[in-house]
Every structure is written in C-alpha cells, then in structure tokens.
C-alpha cells in the first residue's frame, strides 16, 4: 500500500496518515468498547467467536474493494483525467486516493474486531506456560506466507494490485471462518455482578480498573514506544528502493532469503521467553534493536553503491533475529502481567493509550521525512534517516521497560507475581 500511494503522488505525510494514523484513530475508539463488551459477553459459542464470525466477512470485502479502487475511479471519471465533483477539480489519481481512504476506513473498522479478539481468543484457549512457543509456531506460518509473497508476488505487486487484494480478501475470510467453526472456547465464570447499567458507569468502571496501578501504566508506556517504532516503517521500503537504489526484485529476494533466518530463530527465541520470562527477553530485544539501528545510520553519511545490497542483507538478518525475540515476548508479556479474566479490557486500554501517541507520532514521522527532503535536496536521500527515527524513539521505550521490570520484581517477580486487582491509584 505505501508503494501504491507513492505511485499515486501522495506525500510522505499523507502516506503515513492514510496507512498508520487512520487505523490508529479507529482503534482508539473501537478497541476499548470491543474489549469491554467481549470480556462480559457469554454466548453459546463463547465470548470471542460470536464477534469474529460477523466481522470477518466485512474485512475481506473491504480488502477486495481497496484492490479495485482504480477500477471504481475509472468508472466514475470515464476517460477524463481531470473532472469536477461538487465544484471541486479532481484528478483521477486523487479520486483513487479518496476511494482507497474510504475503503480503508471500512477495513480498519471491521478489522479492529478481528485483530483485537483474535489475540484474546488465543489467551483464552492456549496454556500460558507454552504461550511463547505457540506464538512462535503461529509466526513461523505467517513468515512462510510472507516469504513466498516477497519472493513471487512483491516484485510485481503494483502490476497486479487488484488480483492480490482480491485473492487476499477471499483467503482471509476462508481462513478465519474455518477457525471460528472449529475452535471451541471453554467455560467462563459469570461476568462481574452489581455493576450499574449505562454508558457513563461503564466508562467509570473501565477507567478505574485499567488505570489503577503503576505496573499497568508502565506496561502501557513501554508498549507505546515499541509501537512507535512502526510509525516510520512505511519508509523502510522507500529507503531500500528509492534511496539505496535496490530494485523491487532485489528487495523481494532479500526478504525471502532473510526470512529463512527468521524461521530458524523464532522457536529458540520463544524458548528463551518461556525460560527466562518474556519481560526480560523483551527488554534485551529493545536494547539490541537500538544498537542495530545506530549502525544502520551509516547510510546517512555514505553510499556504498553495489555493496548496499550485501550490507542490507547483514542488517536485515540481524534485525530478524532481534525481532524474533521481541515478537515472541511482547504478547506473552502482556498475558503474564494483565489479569486473565479481564485481559481483553486491559489490552483495550493499552490500545487506547498507544493510539493517543501513535496518531500524532505517525503524522510527525511523515512530516519529518517531508521536511528532510527540503534539506537533503533532489533525490530521496531523506529516507536514509529512517533508522535514526527508530533509534530516537526506542530510548524512552527502554527506560519504561527497565522501570517495568523493577516494579514487576517488587511485586514478586518470576516466582511470586500476581496481577494487582483493585488498588489505590499510583502514578508514574
């Protein structure tokens, strides 16, 4: 999608806003509501699957519609490249951008249900002592799909945009619906009784339960800065292609071959998380990620010509190893710290706090690259600053992760930690 928007003439700021901030804005409003209602829902098929069944088909539908945005724009504009709508002069690429944005709103709205409740379902049905290894196996399957995509589809993704989105939407619906009709949820205790009905009392309950202890606030802030690492991720592909001069085929092949390394290290990384506790391994991963991106800043000062590809292979292999640790530690870390009965609501609060920072953060990332373009002059040298953004953003994340580890140890650590329940508020 970033390449498609770039081809349509979108600025870096608009690219970041459409791809990142729009989804974050919808997440801010939807995730707490979904989490609160799902945790308290008791249906014949459980508390997660009923929501997944109705939302999944709409996710696939909007994926297909996004793929056909060009066709809809051509249908509305005919053969004209410039035309009038409601008194406004609009070009065909701008109309395509508008349609993509509209369909993306629908996609983000419906996928907020699936993306949220899928992880809650995993927490409900998978034993916690093997959670990291389960997530590793889940990621391995995902990476196999990504590797095949990068090898055989990515190099021509702009040429077959419609077909890719149509097939992806259909596969998405089929895969998730199979899961919904085969996975069985267990029994849950009844929802909390004695709560006042109504929207305002629900908000008060939600706020009191989610933000009542220091350790939860530290989890939220650690998660915020980890998420902000992805605020500029759209520009990684632009760094590799536009700035470093690599072809789409080069990047696709690199992602395929380095993905093999990812597959090899995911399960050992998950074993480390289960063995030493995911909070510890997550902190190690953040520190290593910071150091790696400092080294990648070398491209700000020097271009290595044909050696760029070899150097990028080295950095990507190292990054995949570190990301394996982070990916197999993040979700299990939340599952070990948040109360299990209210896990969805705590994740909803986490998503809400993350979004408050991510919306301005992603727009700021795009704006920074637009401003850098003015200072770096002609060409696309500004994208070489992508790892600098990552290095700067990750420092507060390391600080909060250290503070989280200290609070976790104070509350019992690996041997005796119990998620705090109703306690007096405690700030950072």
Which positions does each model-derived feature cover?
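Short amphipathic helix-loop junctions that connect adjacent transmembrane helices
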Residues: 1-14, 234-251
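Helix-to-loop junctions at the C-terminal end of transmembrane segments
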Residues: 29-45, 265-278, 369
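C-terminal transmembrane helical hairpin of 12-TM major facilitator-type secondary transporters
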Residues: 280-327
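Glycine-rich segments within core transmembrane alpha-helices of 12-TM secondary carriers
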Residues: 23-28, 132-154, 351-362
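Juxtamembrane intracellular "pre-TM" segments in multi-pass secondary transporters
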Residues: 187-219, 419-428
């Amino acid at each position: 999608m970033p390449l498609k928007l770039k081809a349509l003439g979108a600025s870096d700021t608009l690219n970041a806003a459409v791809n990142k901030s729009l989804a974050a804005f919808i997440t801010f409003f939807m995730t707490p509501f979904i989490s609160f209602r799902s945790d308290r829902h008791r249906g014949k098929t459980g508390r997660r699957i009923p929501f997944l069944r109705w939302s999944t088909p709409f996710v696939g539908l909007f994926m297909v519609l996004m793929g056909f945005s060009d066709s809809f724009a051509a249908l509305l504009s005919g053969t004209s490249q410039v035309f009038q709508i409601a008194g406004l002069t609009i070009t065909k690429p701008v109309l395509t951008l508008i349609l993509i944005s509209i369909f993306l709103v629908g996609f983000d709205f419906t996928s907020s249900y699936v993306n949220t409740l899928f992880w809650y379902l995993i927490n409900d049905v998978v034993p916690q002592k093997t959670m990291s290894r389960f997530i590793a196996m889940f990621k391995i399957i995902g990476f196999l799909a990504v590797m095949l995509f990068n090898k055989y589809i990515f190099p021509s993704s702009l040429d077959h945009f419609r077909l890719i989105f149509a097939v992806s939407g259909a596969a998405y619906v089929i895969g998730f619906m199979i899961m919904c009709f085969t996975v069985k949820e267990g029994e849950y205790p009844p929802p909390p009784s004695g709560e006042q009905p109504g929207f305002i009392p629900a908000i008060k309950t939600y706020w009191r339960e989610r933000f009542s202890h220091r350790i939860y606030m530290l989890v939220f802030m650690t998660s915020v800065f980890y998420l902000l690492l992805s605020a500029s991720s759209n520009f990684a592909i632009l760094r590799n292609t536009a700035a470093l001069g690599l072809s789409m085929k080069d990047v696709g092949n690199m992602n395929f071959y380095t993905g093999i390394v990812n597959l090899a290290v995911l399960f050992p990384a998950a074993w480390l998380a289960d063995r030493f506790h995911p909070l510890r391994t997550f902190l190690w991963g953040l520190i290593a990620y910071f150091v790696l991106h400092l080294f990648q800043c070398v491209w700000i000062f020097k271009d290595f010509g044909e050696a760029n590809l070899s150097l990028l292979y080295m950095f990507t292999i190292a990054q995949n190893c570190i990301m394996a640790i982070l990916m197999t530690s993040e979700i299990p870390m939340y599952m070990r710290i948040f109360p299990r009965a209210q896990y969805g609501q705590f994740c909803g609060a986490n998503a809400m706090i993350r979004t408050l920072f991510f919306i301005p953060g992603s727009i700021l990332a795009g704006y920074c690259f637009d401003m850098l373009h003015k200072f770096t002059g002609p060409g696309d040298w500004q994208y070489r600053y992508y790892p600098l953004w990552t290095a700067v953003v990750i420092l507060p994340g390391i600080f909060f992760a250290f503070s989280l580890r200290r609070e976790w140890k104070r509350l019992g650590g690996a041997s005796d930690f119990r998620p705090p329940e109703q306690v007096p508020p405690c700030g950072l």
